A protein has these predicted regions:
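Positively charged n-region of N-terminal signal peptides that target proteins for export
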Residues: 1-4
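Terminal non-domain segments
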Residues: 7-8, 207
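Hydrophobic h-region of N-terminal signal peptides that target proteins for export
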Residues: 8-18
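Beta-propeller-forming repeat regions
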Residues: 17-295
Length: 295
């Protein structure tokens, strides 16, 4: 038994020591301004494709040939800014939503800033998909398909800034969860998730309790917050940190302790991790303070 254990551990160490090797492969040299990428199976062949949100079009590249398929031209007068892709109905093919009309200087007038679209796919997943425009807040900036139950998903959309008040200061931004009807061309219902986060650059889906309903972490001027639903499907929140943060991702240590990593502040210089504690605010550890314009 001892020899067997020794051999097993030795094998594990040798495997862990092997460094992965990668080679660069250019698949498109004609990207305008690439605002976002998603990885998902677009045509049901069980291979992960690449979906690109370019400033004036939405395209996907077919794995493994990387053949390019444009599914949308310019949806708004200004740039597209974000995209989310995920299989919502279990058919093995991802659905797409897009944010556009990127206008960082306008956070009050929704006719001049922000846009949210669901792209209704063609049968062959090629050609121009039909855009379905949804209500939106100004400054549309990030979005995710968030699982709300077994086989159910909401489109959660976050602006960068909230509206500017009479004193010239920006208020909290409204984050909405959109629910798709059976016919996506019909009216979508939506629920207000929050309205207090200021200067919020990004958010990240999680499912810490593994109940099939996802939560998310959101980074902003206020710090990093957790948002999730209770048993009555009402949105609740908890604050885990107070430092101004622009990016956030979660993980587990080798011993299984939960943590999240953040770039502080927005477009900042510092990488910090926060280890879960019994206290409200998690334990902060700085990893690096030499970043420039960290994303």
């Amino acid at each position: 038994m001892k020899n067997f254990t020794f051999i097993t551990l030795g094998f594990a160490v040798s495997v862990a020591a092997v460094e992965p090797k990668f080679r660069a492969q250019e698949i498109d040299a004609k990207v305008g301004v690439g605002y976002g990428l998603q990885l998902a199976d677009m045509d049901g062949d069980k291979k992960t494709d690449i979906i690109l949100c370019d400033k004036d079009k939405i395209v996907w590249y077919h794995n493994p040939t990387w053949e390019k398929h444009q599914v949308s031209g310019h949806l708004t007068k200004r740039d597209h800014v974000c995209i989310t892709a995920r299989d919502l109905d279990g058919d093995g093919k991802a659905e797409i939503a897009v944010g556009g009309q990127w206008n960082i200087g306008e956070s009050n007038d929704a006719s001049k800033s922000g846009a949210v679209f669901y792209l209704n796919p063609t049968t062959d997943r090629k050609g121009n998909w039909t855009p379905v425009q949804l209500p939106h807040e100004p400054n549309t900036h990030r979005m995710h398909w968030i699982q709300s139950g077994k086989g159910k998903f909401d489109l959660v959309v976050k602006p960068l800034y909230g509206p500017k008040g009479a004193d010239g200061r920006k208020r909290g931004a409204k984050v909405w969860a959109y629910h798709m009807p059976k016919d996506p061309t019909k009216e979508w219902s939506r629920i207000l998730v929050s309205n207090f986060m200021k200067d919020s650059h990004n958010f990240h889906p999680i499912d810490w309790d593994r109940d099939g309903r996802e939560e998310f972490l959101q980074a902003g001027l206020n710090g990093v917050y957790w948002f999730g639903r209770d048993k009555n499907d009402e949105w609740k929140y908890m604050q885990f940190s107070q430092n101004y943060a622009g990016e956030v991702r979660d993980g587990l240590t080798a011993r299984g302790k939960r943590f999240f990593a953040a770039i502080e502040p927005k477009h900042g210089t510092t990488v910090a991790i926060y280890l879960q504690t019994k206290a409200q605010f998690w334990q902060r550890r700085v990893l690096d303070e030499t970043l420039k314009d960290g994303h």
